[in-house]
Amino acid sequence: MKRIAASALFSAELLERLRRLGGRIRDARVHRRLRQVDLAAKAGLSRSTIEAIERGEPATSLGAYAHVLWVMGQDREIDLLADPGLDRQGIALSFSSVDKRVRPRTRLDNDF
């Protein structure tokens, strides 16, 4: 199976946000006077994974990003990701919909 380039899968805005996150993680590591190999050892990850995180690579797992943040004591704001209380669009949509179950709008064609 052919791999699809990240630029084809992700928006330029998202890729830029990941690059900025990687830069902030790199800055946090440097402020703690940790080399990449030191952070990799503390996190139980490879140095190449730390490099990928610091570049903001989208193919690197969310778990790896979160674990590195945790190792450096920077994981507190992870709870804010996809927080239903902060999802203005989701809240607005929930008030406009009476039905709480998610169902397909049309009947699925199971005839294959």
Task: Give the label of every model feature segment.
Residues 25, 36, 47, 62-65:
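Helix-turn-helix DNA-binding elements, focusing on the entry/boundary residues of the two helices
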Residues 79-112:
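Short, charged recognition helix plus adjacent turn
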Residues 33-51:
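Short alpha-helical DNA-recognition segment
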Residues 23-38, 100-106:
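Short basic helix-loop element that most often maps to the first helix and adjoining turn
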Residues 57-70:
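Short, basic-rich loop-to-helix N-cap that marks the start of a DNA-contacting helix
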Residues 6-31:
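A short, Lys/Arg-rich alpha-helix, primarily the initiator
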